[in-house]
Swiss-Prot record:
Heterotetramer of two alpha chains and two epsilon chains in early embryonic hemoglobin Gower-2; two zeta chains and two epsilon chains in early embryonic hemoglobin Gower-1. GO terms for molecular function: haptoglobin binding; heme binding; hemoglobin alpha binding; metal ion binding; organic acid binding; oxygen binding; oxygen carrier activity; peroxidase activity. GO terms for cellular component: blood microparticle; haptoglobin-hemoglobin complex; hemoglobin complex. The modification Phosphoserine is found at residues 14, 51. Heme b binds at residues 64, 93. It holds the Pfam family Globin. This is Hemoglobin subunit epsilon. Residues 3-147 form the Globin domain. The gene is HBE1. The keyword Secreted does not apply. Belongs to the globin family.
Amino acid sequence: MVHLTAEEKSSVTSLWGKMNVDEAGGEALGRLLVVYPWTQRFFDNFGNLSSSSAIMGNPKVKAHGKKVLTSFGDAIKNMDNLKGAFAKLSELHCDKLHVDPENFRLLGNVLVIILVTHFGKDFTPEVQVAWQKLVSGVATALAHKYH
């Protein structure tokens, strides 16, 4: 899977400890739905997704975004076993929800953008390396059931 050094794990954990999951989760999922509008088809029960402002202000988007980032917190607790940590979510997204696994990669990239906007100068290139490894590993773990 993905190998993070002890230093990379520390930088991920440190930054995550400062993360406002409620706020950032809604931002990340909202941005995914705005930037990649075809992903909206998986959220047809979320109500008004007709514009960027409607999406970013949608309470269901915010609530599900929080849920998504909370599961990312689980990844941080299980960086050495992402496949195991995401086995059930992989099965759910593959077998029941039929989500295109490419969307996991897109969400990971959006999360990195959210981290940059929230942490600015603290999100150094070295910190980004660690986070890119993590979001790539999470995307691979979530896509595991598809193979």
